[in-house]
Amino acid sequence: MAGFQLSELKLTGYFPGVVGKITEFHATYYYENWGFDVSFETQVGRELSEFLMGFQEKRDGFWVATIAGGFAGAIAIDGRQAGKEGARVRWFIVTPGFQGKGIGRTLLRKSIEFCKEAGYKRIYLWTFKGLEPARYLYELEGFRLCKEHEVRQWGQDIVEQMFKLNLEP
């Protein structure tokens, strides 16, 4: 959508159909740009559904970005294992038409703010090498690369990367 103002951005939570939208945008984007196969789409849909079925408001976060009622992106914080590795950033996506316009930064900052308020000591996320705009955003917000390894996953050879953000003073 051309010509929108960031002030038009609304962050909401769950609404009917959003699991399908998030899964669809992940599947389409990663198929078209990276050749990911059906196992990626089914994993996103299954794990996102499981997360939302067990969602606990004080432990987990889930935000959907919309502009003029249209889906623009999403992000979640999965706090189920926060005592071990930290709270996990998941299902972070901004639709291609809205990338590079501040929506990703808004979503990521909202998730970091939630983690601070929840008292989490660390936040982490898994991604893969080659997503440079996302990496730039993660590093801009203080995340640091702490692990990487080669893996065959979703029909492709990729280099998985783990980024962490320490929230302790």
Q: Language model features by range: what are they?
A:
Residues 84, 102, 133:
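Residues that form or flank phosphate/diphosphate-binding pockets in enzymes
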Residues 3, 7-10, 121-169:
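C-terminal "cap" of GNAT-fold acetyltransferases
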Residues 9-97, 105-110, 114, 118, ...:
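Acetyl-CoA-dependent GNAT
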Residues 95-101, 129-130:
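Active-site acidic-Proline motif in GNAT/NAT acetyltransferases
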